[in-house]
C-alpha cells in the first residue's frame, strides 16, 4: 500500500514539475496530424468512375457514392460519377 502511494505521488510530482514536457508532446502530435490528413484529403478528394478501387481507404469513414448524370443538357449520353460522401 505504501509503495502504491509512493508511485502515485511520484508521478504527480513529475507531471507537476515538468508540465512543459507533456505540452511539447501534445504540440508535436497537433502539428503532424493536420499535415498528414491534408495530404490524404488532397489525394482522396477526386471524382471517380467507380468505387471498386478505393485506394488507401480514402472514403473511410464515409462511403463511396455513385450516380449517373448527363454530359450536357442537349445530350442523352450519361456519365457515371463517384465521390466520397458522409451520406
From Swiss-Prot:
Expressed by the venom gland. GO terms for molecular function: calcium channel regulator activity; toxin activity. Disulfide bonds join 44-59, 51-64, 58-84, 66-82. The keyword Secreted applies. Its main location: secreted. Residues 18-40 form a propeptide. Keywords: Calcium channel impairing toxin, Disulfide bond, Ion channel impairing toxin, Knottin, Neurotoxin, Secreted, Signal, Toxin, Voltage-gated calcium channel impairing toxin. It is found in: Secreted. Coiled coil: none annotated. One of its GO terms (cellular component) is extracellular region. Residues 1-17 form the signal peptide. The keyword Protein biosynthesis does not apply. According to the nomenclature proposed by King and colleagues (2008), 'Gsp(267)' comes from the species name 'Geolycosa sp (strain A267TDLS2-KZARNA)'. This species has been reclassified since that study, as indicated in the work of Oparin and colleagues (2016). The primary structure of the mature protein is identical to the fragment sequence of Omega-lycotoxin-Lp1a from Lycosa praegrandis (AC P0DRA9). The presence of a 'disulfide through disulfide knot' structurally defines this protein as a knottin. Belongs to the neurotoxin omega-lctx family. Modulates Cav2.1/CACNA1A voltage-gated calcium channels (P/Q-type currents) in rat cerebellar Purkinje cells and hippocampal CA1-CA3 neurons. At saturating concentrations (>10 nM) decelerates activation kinetics and slightly increases peak amplitude without affecting deactivation kinetics. In vivo, does not cause death when intravenously injected into mice. In rat models, through its activity on Cav2.1/CACNA1A, has an ameliorative effect on memory defects provoked by hyperstimulation of N-methyl-D-aspartate receptors (NMDARs) in the hippocampus. This is Omega-lycotoxin-Am1a. It comes from Alopecosa marikovskyi.
